[in-house]
């Protein structure tokens, strides 16, 4: 079998012969971890601080290969933002930041992530911005678990690890709180989520929260307000909080189209959760009756675009 960098060969049967006077912790490994486990147990009985590498060299090698694959994927994703999707994603991201003055020197920004494609892209764009910007600012990648299923929680954590995004997760019981609300549970859920995010961001010393709403979200919100609310309202690129003094909400994806986000996702063969809400655990493809008002608006825009692609 192969070797692990920094390791030294040893005759298991002869140990502890050859060990230094004060060896400290001894980590043993063999091909599959069986012999090293037995040897570690024997050494512990003799008073040594010994342990065995779980799964042996082969398991270690597999973990290393997976890590290399993850590093290669992360590098490919980042290169796609710098090259193939530079104009549609990166340039529109930085344009919104300049045009609406969303990021300023010494800002501490909580990049709020739901685990979907939009917020994960936003996180990667902020990482790029930190690499290339000429002024200092800091970022917290914040994930609120409002009651996700274990499967969705695992997907979020694995994607963050895969894309090298150091997330901070905190929990709330929002899904349970709105589960029995009959009228506008989604609206109430959104308001409660934002309040929790503001509160946690402020606790972490942030002065801004960044949300992953894109250009299409803005259009859909205007139409939803007109058709279902009888009023004209929209999402602004930035808002000062009225309930959390000194806090500001920014939307740096304001000029990015959703189709471009989907192209980036599919080009890199990435897979994210969609709506992880308990109301939509049976997704709309399985249960069309669960389709939301926003989905109705999306469908309407899709039909209109066939008549006028512009």
Cite the ranges covered by each PLM segment:
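Short active-site oxyanion
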Residues: 5-6, 24-26, 207-208, 247-251
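An accessory alpha-helical subdomain
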Residues: 296-310
């Amino acid at each position: 079998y192969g070797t692990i960098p920094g390791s030294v060969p040893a005759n298991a049967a002869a140990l502890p012969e050859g060990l230094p006077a004060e060896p400290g912790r001894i980590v043993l490994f063999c091909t599959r971890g069986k012999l090293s486990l037995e040897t570690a147990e024997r050494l512990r009985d003799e008073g040594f601080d010994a342990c065995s590498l779980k799964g042996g060299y082969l398991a270690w090698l597999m973990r290393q290969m997976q890590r290399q694959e993850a590093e290669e994927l992360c590098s490919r994703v980042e290169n796609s933002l710098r090259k193939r999707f530079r104009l549609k994603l990166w340039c529109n991201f930085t344009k919104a930041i300049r045009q609406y003055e969303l990021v300023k020197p010494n800002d501490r920004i909580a990049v709020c992530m739901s685990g979907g494609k939009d917020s994960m892209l936003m996180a990667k764009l902020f990482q790029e911005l930190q690499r290339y910007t000429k002024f200092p600012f800091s970022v917290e990648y914040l994930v609120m678990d409002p009651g996700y299923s274990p499967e969705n929680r695992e997907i979020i954590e694995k994607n963050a690890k895969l894309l090298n995004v150091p997330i901070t997760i905190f929990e709330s019981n929002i899904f349970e709180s709105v589960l029995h609300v009959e009228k506008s549970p989604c609206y109430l859920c959104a308001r409660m989520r934002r309040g929790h995010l503001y509160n946690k961001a402020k606790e972490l010393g942030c002065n801004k929260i960044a949300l992953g709403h894109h250009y299409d979200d803005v259009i859909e919100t205007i139409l939803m307000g007109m058709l279902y609310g009888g009023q004209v309202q929209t999402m602004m690129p930035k808002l000062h909080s009225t309930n959390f003094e000194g806090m500001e909400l920014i939307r740096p994806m304001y000029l990015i189209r959703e189709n471009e986000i989907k192209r980036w996702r599919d080009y890199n063969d990435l897979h994210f959760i969609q709506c992880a809400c308990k109301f939509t655990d049976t997704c709309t493809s399985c249960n069309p009756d669960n389709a939301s008002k926003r989905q109705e608006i999306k469908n309407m825009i899709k039909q209109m675009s066939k008549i006028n692609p512009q």
